[in-house]
Amino acid sequence: MTDVFSAINGRTSANNFDPTHVMTQAEITELAQLANQTPTSFNQQNWRLVAVNTPAAKARLKAAAYNQPKVGDAAVTFVVVGKVGGHKDLPVLIKPMLDGGYIDQAAFDGWIGMANGMYDGKDQFQRDEAIRS
């Protein structure tokens, strides 16, 4: 747990990048996989990552980001795309927990019922939750 505290307390915001640095696809994939381990409401992972790392894509993103140099200079920029309606994926996402015996049918049904009660018909709330996650 000390490593977690050290990482959180030692983090900094980076604004200057070496524009000649290139990340491998394996490094980009590992970063994305680590991001996917972060907690979300009902573990729905109601967002997707888009890795922007080609010169052409970085140039388009930089133009859309008010020409911030860091967007063009970074080896990769991850765009986080929120997913409205992510709670509808919950039965598929948590079925392995049911099948593995980690939760029983009542807990499975309860989670789905709670998620549907929280999110159904509440587009603004779903959008806000995707941004928060």
PLM segments and residue spans:
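Acidic, surface-exposed loops and disordered segments
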Residues: 1-133
